[in-house]
C-alpha cells in the first residue's frame, strides 16, 4: 500500500514539473501572458508658445514606445491645474506564447487638450525614465 502511494506521489510531482517546464520558455505565466511595464521616453512636446486666454491649448507628445507591435501605451498619469500639466507615460511590453508581433515600431503620438482658464505661463512637464524632466512653457494672453 505504501509503495502505491509513493508511486502516485512521484507521478504527481512529475506532471507538475512537466507542466511548469512547458510554461517557462513560452513567456507565459500560469494565468496568461506576462507583461513588462516601463516609463516611455518623450522626445518632444509640441505646444504653441502663445495662446489666447479664451482658446484651448493642445499639447502633443512624441516619442518611441517600442521596436514592434508587442509594445504599447498602457496608461497616462496626469495632474492638471490652472497653471500646469504634469504627465508620465507608462508602457507595457506583452510576451505571449505563439504570438507574432507586427514588425513596425510603435510610436508615441499623444495629444492633451486643455480648456481655459489657463494661468500664464502655463507649464507642461513630462517625467522621463531616467528621472529627468522635459518642460515646455506657453504664454497665455
Where do the language-model regions lie?
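Sec-dependent bacterial lipoprotein signal peptides
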Residues: 1-28
Amino acid at each position: 500500500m505504501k509503495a502505491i502511494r509513493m508511486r502516485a506521489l512521484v507521478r504527481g510531482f512529475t506532471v507538475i514539473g512537466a507542466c511548469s517546464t512547458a510554461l517557462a520558455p513560452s513567456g507565459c505565466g500560469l494565468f496568461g501572458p506576462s507583461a513588462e511595464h516601463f516609463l516611455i521616453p518623450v522626445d518632444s512636446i509640441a505646444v504653441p508658445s502663445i495662446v489666447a486666454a479664451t482658446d484651448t491649448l493642445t499639447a502633443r507628445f512624441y516619442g518611441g514606445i517600442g521596436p514592434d507591435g508587442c509594445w504599447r501605451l498602457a496608461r497616462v498619469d496626469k495632474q492638471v491645474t490652472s497653471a500646469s500639466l504634469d504627465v508620465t507615460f507608462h508602457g507595457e511590453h506583452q510576451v505571449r506564447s505563439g504570438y507574432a508581433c507586427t514588425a513596425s515600431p510603435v510610436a508615441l503620438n499623444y495629444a492633451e487638450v486643455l480648456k481655459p482658464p489657463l494661468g500664464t505661463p502655463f507649464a507642461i512637464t513630462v517625467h522621463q525614465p531616467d528621472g529627468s524632466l522635459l518642460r515646455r512653457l506657453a504664454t497665455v494672453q
